[in-house]
Amino acid sequence: MRLAILIGLGGFALAACATAPTSVGGETVARPASSPFERDRDAILAMAGTFKVTFDFIETAALDADYEPKERKVSGGYEIVKVIEDRGDFISLQHILYVGGEDKFPLKHWRQDWQHEPNRVLTFIGGNAWTLEDVTARDRRGAWSQEVYQVDDSPRYGAVGRWTYDNGIPAWQPAQAWRPLPRRDMTTRDDYHAVDAVNRHAITPKGWLHEQDNTKLVLSSGEPEALVREVAINTYARTNEVDNAEVDTHWEATKAFWAGVRDVWKTFQNEGEPFALTLKGEPGDLYMPILGLASQIEDGEMSSEAALKEAREIIATYTTLDLPPLTERLR
């Protein structure tokens, strides 16, 4: 039942902080709470909590003579964002959906990892493939990378930017970067291959916003060709309408498994070489079995250790370091 609902989530793209230590040159240094570093941390941690979410996407301008913009897509639901790791200069936020009509239940969603002054950043290069790009000393100074991961902890995209506080609003915006198709399009259309996105996060009195200025790209010729512009705004408003105890129970039952799955994916990033999925388009054959393993753990049908062994085999089946040309990786 839970996995069937996930397939239908096209619209979902299927805290106050004390002074924290961080590592500088091998030494642990305590930074004052008033430092720019701590102010940035507070902004990132403000994205954790329980939210009522609205996803609003509208194609605004056709950039191809034969294309007609699609109808606006608006959806919503509830989302819990948990801090699952905080090392001072690294913060990991796990999103969990709360779905299912009257009988709602929690379901693991996407994850965002924030690294202060990163040396490298995960970069999507099209056709379900990624590489690690070096970040120059100038670009990393005072900056944070955000790397975003799928429901099965496989990669989606990453970028580097600085938090700003103009007009009293904490906001983060990186340079324009590619990302894979969102699930709302990946499962319903096949006329483009990547999104060239300007991505903004802003903290508001009631929660936070995720704004996007997207250009949908066709890559069939090997060179990007713009199809249409899209504007998106995802609104996260704090709410007390969710049974957080149920969400906590769900996460406690599966968190060891997901920590192991994250470690498997980290091996690719640690290698520093380009890597890809062997699947074209929507990688359901990868993420559905892994989500199924998590459900079996939660239902008491399988241990985390046994499930992780199977997850490693699934990931190995659908990943490669031997990348074919871009046009051969497209569906």
Predicted regions and their residues:
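Short helix-loop boundary/capping segments
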Residues: 142-196, 216
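Hydrophobic/aromatic beta-strand elements that line small-molecule binding cavities or substrate pockets
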Residues: 69-71, 75-85, 94, 111-112, ...
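N-terminal intrinsically disordered, cationic/polar leader segments
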Residues: 64, 86-126
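N-terminal helix-cap/turn-to-beta initiation motif at the start of protein domains
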Residues: 34-50
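Positively charged n-region of N-terminal signal peptides that target proteins for export
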Residues: 1-4
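Acidic, serine/threonine-rich low-complexity disordered tracts
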Residues: 193-331
